[in-house]
């Protein structure tokens, strides 16, 4: 009887040991998943050296801030050249094919393969420059137009009486566009601060 009781206790302890190991494994898996999620956050993303050079060259050519250009790419695609949105925007800068075609006609830049960063980034940089000129260097309006389209931004300016100096991102009616502008400007500020520290 005593031997059977001891055996039973050992089995209980063994079972508890297995439960502890299972809980530890589960906790470890959750922590690993959380670490992957945190590290995949856009604030930790960095472009490859090749993409960094392409960003610098395109920004210089179009006379725009490299930090702004990188921040748009970061927000749009997290540097994924194969990114395709649910509405059909393609590549790192998430250009719609018809917009890319128009940019190509206006700029003379190729727009044959939008998944190629060497085509996509120069087209997007040209477009940002164009929008900044259209909106008198107002980055908020230019970024809103990049995301929601010029027609929408022009209509908002008319409907809400926005002027060239518009600065209240919270007034942007489309939630997606509002968050896009906030994300790009925050990333741009962070990138500029990092650059200043170097």
Regions found by a protein language model. Name each.
Residues 15-19, 23, 139:
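Structural motif marking the loop-to-transmembrane transition
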Residues 21-39:
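Hydrophobic membrane-insertion alpha-helices, especially the h-region
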Residues 10-14, 28-33, 48-52:
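Short juxtamembrane and helix-loop transition motifs at transmembrane-helix boundaries
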């Amino acid at each position: 009887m005593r031997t059977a009781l001891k055996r039973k206790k050992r089995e209980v302890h063994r079972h508890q040991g297995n439960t502890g190991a299972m809980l530890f494994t589960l906790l470890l898996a959750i922590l690993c998943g959380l670490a992957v999620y945190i590290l995949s956050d856009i604030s930790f993303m960095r472009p490859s050296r090749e993409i960094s050079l392409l960003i610098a060259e395109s920004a210089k050519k179009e006379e725009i801030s490299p930090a702004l250009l990188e921040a748009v790419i970061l927000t749009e695609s997290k540097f994924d050249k194969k990114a395709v949105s649910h509405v059909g925007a393609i590549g790192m800068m998430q250009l719609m094919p018809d917009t890319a075609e128009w940019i190509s006609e206006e700029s003379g830049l190729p727009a044959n393969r939008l998944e190629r960063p060497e085509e996509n980034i120069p087209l997007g940089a040209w477009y940002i420059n164009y929008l900044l000129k259209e909106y008198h260097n107002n980055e908020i309006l230019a970024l809103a137009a990049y995301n929601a389209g010029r027609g929408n931004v022009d209509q908002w300016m008319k409907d809400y009486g926005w002027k060239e100096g518009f600065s209240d991102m919270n007034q942007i009616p489309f939630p997606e566009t509002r968050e896009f502008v906030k994300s790009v400007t925050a990333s741009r500020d962070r990138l500029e601060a990092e650059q200043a520290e170097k």
